[in-house]
Amino acid sequence: MAILRANLSPKNKLNATLKGWLPILQSELEDLEEVLKQNALDNPLIKIENKRIKNFSDRFNTKKSSDHLENCATASKSLFETLESQIIPPLFPTETSQKIAMDIISGLNNEGYFEENIEERAKVLGVESEVYEKVRKRFSYLNPAGIGAKDVKEGFLFQLDGRELDNNELYEETRKIILNLEKHHEFSKDFYYEKALKILKSFKNPPAIEFLEKEIEVIPELFILEVDNEMIVRLNDESYPTISLEENRFKDSDYLKEKLKEAKDLIDALNLRKATIYKIGLMLLEYQYDFFKGKELRPLKLLDLANEFNHSVSTISRAISNKYLACERGVFPIKHFFSIALDNSETSNAVIKDYLLELIKNEDKKEPLSDAKILELIEEKFHLKMVRRTITKYRQLLNIASSSERKRLYLMRA
């Protein structure tokens, strides 16, 4: 972490400035101009201008940015967060099912449809395509209704299943019309035709239409880019408001000299905000380098960041709230890069569970691994201390049978 410590400002100046201007650090980039103006209401020396670039695509182009939710330069804040909050048990009970679900979310286009190749996505995650598809089908139970469907017809079928109609004949009529949308007029004489059409007209088309209507511009604070085979961090300085001073007009007034000092303090606070966000970017690049090269996230605690800046976790949490980072893999909330660690170690629950799954997948079918042996292998790999009941708990959460039950199942399949 030397790269960060070498750049940190003196603690006294940092603490004094943050105490006075903490709202500047915590505000969202799109709200920063208003926050600065509130601080400068009674200061005639300050002029605040917004030089924000509305479209930063010329500076930073994400792959398939127009197609994918997480890769949108202009993207809905709430659709991703709405879906992410639903990726929990019992619908997604295992680490694997949750990982697949998050991958599906990342593959949604801006209308809410999933147009990715399932076989290819499953291969990337190391799961069977049937397992991947099974998880995708569970999206029929999520909101907004129809999300995750492959096309309009499947989106309507998802929404129909969510209606839970008491009348089975009406259900079948509606389903028949959906499957034959191009020639639905052929069923116009059916008894339930009009009622079925009324149901269809109430469906969302496309599934994410309500989010398209209230699309919010997400402006990243940071860019992490690969330039000349080197990963670098850049602050989105073009989107920051500027503060200029008209100090030459007033030199004799003590009152205005005081206002000049206040103005310079405001500039210092803004510069400190930039420096703080930039250093957060440096830390993320250092800790999550593998992620920015296309691999998995590493466990990273907010406490690590708080210790670097000598501030409380709650202060740092508020500082990164509603702030975004853009990289080749998309646009992400900065909080996306932090996880809850296991027993204050460097290893997260998710990493442990993934390794447990890998061990079971590759175990000797004649002599399946006991929980005690799995514990030994995990402690050896990650250099940490655990208890066997934790391994048993993780195994049960992942719906993995005991070693004796697995041995019996293996023999039955032989």
Curated annotation (Swiss-Prot):
Gene Ontology MF annotations: DNA binding; DNA-binding transcription activator activity; nucleotidyltransferase activity; sigma factor activity
Keywords: DNA-binding, DNA-directed RNA polymerase, Nucleotidyltransferase, Sigma factor, Transcription, Transcription regulation, Transferase
Pfam family, one: Sigma54_CBD
GO cellular component assignments: DNA-directed RNA polymerase complex
DNA-binding region(s), chain positions: 301-320
Nucleotidyltransferase recorded as keyword: yes
GO BP annotations listed: DNA-templated transcription initiation
Name listed for the protein in its UniProt record: RNA polymerase sigma-54 factor
Gene name linked to the record: rpoN
